[in-house]
Amino acid sequence: MRINLFESDLERVARTLTDQFGVQVICQGDEAWTDGQRIVLPSLPEPMDDRLERMIVGYLDHEMAHVAFSDFKVVKEFSGKHPGHEAMLNVVEDALIEKRAMQRWPGVRANLDAMFAQIRDRVKGLA
């Protein structure tokens, strides 16, 4: 039952994003990313706890911020001119788009904080 409620909420947010930004939200694979036309989130495991739900919503907020604030043309041009340096640009861009998202949508900060805490805990578990 819990996963169905979360999936329902996620679908509602996805519909809002589609209406507002014209993007599609799908869950597949094990990474979160966007190309500006669609947002891909990791597949949803069962069962999910509250921390994992917040992490998925944090991913959605982060990728939504890319859709709202990234200039994909500039990113593509940079990648063409500076192959191998895309990760450096992405780090700077992530900080900028997340700051703008937190200013525009106040609830985003809590979701990003939860996402980073979950990622940090998973990385610590690998050490």
List the predicted regions and their residue ranges.
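Basic/hydrophobic alpha-helical interface regions
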Residues: M1-A127
